[in-house]
């Protein structure tokens, strides 16, 4: 197991959104593992960025612990995991206490937030690779498409280049549920709506087989646990994040990706079924490689990525 690494904090002096709005002293929460190596100019040349999913933060790097530990594909890299723009810990409606006055943001804003942090904190303007899980994959793909010379390799995990169909509907439904709640409209925390929204996400995170294997009482208990966790979320964090996700569409841009790309998909993923997402995405990215595997954990099967360490070692090595 990965040793628990304490979070560190930094402030970006000024961050400007695509909209032109700006925030000052923008907080960034991050964690690092591994040792940095320096080139002849004294610049870190072995950085790999890990980007977490919708509900994660910088501690989510533990999901790829098997890759960062001794013997793992990333053991010789300096892995940096950042709590994304809009997520608690980094600049977000809740962390800044701006609430609804926090600027709405896009996936590109999330990418630029990471890029500016890397430059200001570490002097890094090019990384060895970017790994993104789920919504973190949205950022990784956008980064590679918008700034194709800034990374050597790209590993998108259980993700897509666009939000359509059931995923769009889920994000939209969650926002309607929260924004229509009487408590939210009255200016108080809509705990019930947040709880129900979290339960909804839980019911899509695992495979049908996983849910079928649970006793009804176990399923009810798991739903209640997720609901209790969800009730603690900030409504504007959720709404703003969902709005950013709903606008995610890299159609016509994937062809510009130059980084060597290795895509992972789970056959039982109910958010991003391979036939709708990872398979066509692999066909759109030049020379992309695709690995599909089975997991009863569905979307959360990404936690089993360590099983494919040797494939990743070979990929990073260019074999």
Curated annotation (Swiss-Prot):
It comes from Methanothermobacter thermautotrophicus (strain ATCC 29096 / DSM 1053 / JCM 10044 / NBRC 100330 / Delta H) (Methanobacterium thermoautotrophicum). Residues 46-301 form the AB hydrolase-1 domain. Homodimer. One of its GO terms (molecular function) is homoserine O-acetyltransferase activity. SUPFAM superfamilies: alpha/beta-Hydrolases. This is Probable acyltransferase. It is an enzyme of class 2 (transferase). Keywords: Acyltransferase, Cytoplasm, Transferase. It comes from the Archaea. GO terms for biological process: homoserine metabolic process; methionine biosynthetic process. The lineage of its organism: Archaea, Methanobacteriati, Methanobacteriota, Methanomada group, Methanobacteria. One of its GO terms (cellular component) is cytoplasm. Its EC number is 2.3.1.-. It is found in: Cytoplasm. Pfam families: Abhydrolase_1. The keyword rRNA-binding does not apply. Belongs to the AB hydrolase superfamily. MetX family.
């Amino acid at each position: 197991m990965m040793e628990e690494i304490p979070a560190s904090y930094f402030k970006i002096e000024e961050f400007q959104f695509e909209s032109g709005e700006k925030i000052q002293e923008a907080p960034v929460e991050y964690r690092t593992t591994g040792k940095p190596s320096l080139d002849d100019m004294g610049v870190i040349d072995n950085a790999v960025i890990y980007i977490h999913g919708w509900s994660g933060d910088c501690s989510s790097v533990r999901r790829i612990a098997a890759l960062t530990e001794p013997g793992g594909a990333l053991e010789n890299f300096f892995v940096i995991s950042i709590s994304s723009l809009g997520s608690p810990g980094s600049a977000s409606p809740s962390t800044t206490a701006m609430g609804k006055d926090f600027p709405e943001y896009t996936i590109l804003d999330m990418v630029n937030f990471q890029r500016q942090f890397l430059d200001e904190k570490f002097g890094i303007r090019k990384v060895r690779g970017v790994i993104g899980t789920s919504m973190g994959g949205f950022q990784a793909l956008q980064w590679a498409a918008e700034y194709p010379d800034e990374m050597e390799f790209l590993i998108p995990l259980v993700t897509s280049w666009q939000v359509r169909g059931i995923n769009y509907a889920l994000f939209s439904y969650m926002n309607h549920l929260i924004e229509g709640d009487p408590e939210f409209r009255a200016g108080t925390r809509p705990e019930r709506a947040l709880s129900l929204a979290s339960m909804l996400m839980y019911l899509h995170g695992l495979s049908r087989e996983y849910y079928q294997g649970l006793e009804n009482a176990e399923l009810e208990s798991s739903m209640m646990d997720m609901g209790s966790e969800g009730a603690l979320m900030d409504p504007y964090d959720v709404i703003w994040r969902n709005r950013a996700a709903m606008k995610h569409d890299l159609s016509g841009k994937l062809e510009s990706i130059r980084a060597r790309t290795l895509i992972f998909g789970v056959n039982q993923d109910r958010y991003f079924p391979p036939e709708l997402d990872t398979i066509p995405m692999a066909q759109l990215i030049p020379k992309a490689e695709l690995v599909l595997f089975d997991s009863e954990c569905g979307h959360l099967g990404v936690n089993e990525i360590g099983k494919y360490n040797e494939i990743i070692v070979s990929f990073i090595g260019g074999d």
